């Protein structure tokens, strides 16, 4: 039997509130993180991802107390990201109740950190977040580049090559966000999702751009993603997690219903 695909609602947290922006700016309030997480746990989400979206930009660690509160209320895997720069940061988050940590900016500035983290804590709890933006012109061979600091800083790194390198260093999972699609509701960037899913042996989580349930199906069927991450469509009540799971199952995708 194929492994069930996962639906992961994402809590982008800024100043203690769940928010949602378009292309990482233009913020809209979506509620209290603990309450939002509880709702998704009750609805049957497979996992929850908590991203402290100001952590890397403003240079501060993720809110440990909030992670503890969420972990105390949800009984599904919790991934925490934002400002994770050292093994001490990882230990702090795992002790607070996170099951996995997501490393983004620090993976670029210090790739060996990914190796060190995987050696110390195990690949199964190390997620590398890849924020990719298309840099090729229309008609050219598609090419995507890695951006850091919440999508503000270009790195010159090729996204597909970078994904391979991160897996070689020990990443157990990749959280791939299309910066071009984030918040647009235009659907995942299937091109980069498929390119990275085909290039690596670990699960790829597709993120950025979900506007309807067909986009979730496409992420798995066309993009080759193992999991799909979304925020707005769930936060603002357009769809519930059970709606999404049923729809994906009806389209022939193995789901935990």
From Swiss-Prot:
Biological process per Gene Ontology, one example term: L-histidine biosynthetic process
InterPro entries named in the record: Aldolase_TIM (IPR013785), His_biosynth (IPR006062), HisF (IPR004651), IGPS_HisA/HisF (IPR050064), RibuloseP-bd_barrel (IPR011060)
Active site: 12, 131
Pathway field: Amino-acid biosynthesis; L-histidine biosynthesis; L-histidine from 5-phospho-alpha-D-ribose 1-diphosphate: step 5/9
Record keyword NAD present: no
Location in or out of the cell: Cytoplasm
Enzyme Commission number: 4.3.2.10
GO cellular component: cytoplasm
MF-aspect GO terms: imidazoleglycerol-phosphate synthase activity; lyase activity
The reaction(s) this protein catalyses: 5-[(5-phospho-1-deoxy-D-ribulos-1-ylimino)methylamino]-1-(5-phospho-beta-D-ribosyl)imidazole-4-carboxamide + L-glutamine = D-erythro-1-(imidazol-4-yl)glycerol 3-phosphate + 5-amino-1-(5-phospho-beta-D-ribosyl)imidazole-4-carboxamide + L-glutamate + H(+)
Keywords: Amino-acid biosynthesis, Cytoplasm, Histidine biosynthesis, Lyase
Similarity comment: family membership: Belongs to the HisA/HisF family.
Function: IGPS catalyzes the conversion of PRFAR and glutamine to IGP, AICAR and glutamate. The HisF subunit catalyzes the cyclization activity that produces IGP and AICAR from PRFAR using the ammonia provided by the HisH subunit.
Quaternary structure (record): Heterodimer of HisH and HisF.
Protein's name according to its UniProt entry: Imidazole glycerol phosphate synthase subunit HisF
Organism name: Chromohalobacter salexigens (strain ATCC BAA-138 / DSM 3043 / CIP 106854 / NCIMB 13768 / 1H11)
Gene (UniProt): hisF
């Amino acid at each position: 039997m194929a492994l069930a695909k996962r639906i992961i609602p994402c809590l982008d947290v800024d100043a203690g509130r769940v928010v949602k922006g378009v292309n990482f700016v233009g913020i809209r309030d979506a509620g209290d993180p603990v309450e939002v997480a509880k709702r998704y746990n009750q609805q049957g989400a497979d996992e929850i991802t908590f991203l402290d979206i100001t952590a890397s930009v403003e240079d501060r660690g993720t809110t440990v107390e909030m992670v503890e509160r969420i972990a105390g209320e949800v009984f599904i895997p919790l991934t925490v990201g934002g400002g994770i720069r050292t093994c001490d940061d990882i230990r702090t988050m795992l002790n607070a109740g996170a099951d996995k940590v997501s490393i983004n900016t620090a993976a670029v500035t210090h790739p060996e950190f990914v190796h060190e983290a995987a050696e110390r804590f195990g690949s199964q709890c190390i997620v590398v977040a890849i924020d990719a933006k298309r840099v090729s012109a229309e008609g050219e061979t598609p090419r995507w580049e890695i951006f850091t600091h919440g999508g503000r800083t270009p790195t010159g790194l090729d996204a597909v090559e970078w994904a391979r390198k991160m897996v070689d260093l020990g990443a157990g999972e990749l959280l791939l966000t299309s910066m071009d699609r984030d918040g647009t509701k235009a659907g995942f960037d299937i091109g980069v999702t498929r390119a990275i899913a085909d290039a690596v042996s670990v699960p790829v989580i597709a993120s950025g751009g979900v506007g309807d349930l067909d986009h979730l199906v496409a992420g798995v069927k066309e993009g080759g993603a193992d999991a799909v991450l979304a925020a707005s469509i769930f936060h603002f009540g357009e769809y519930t997690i059970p709606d999404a799971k049923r729809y994906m199952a009806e389209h022939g995708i193995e789901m935990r219903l």
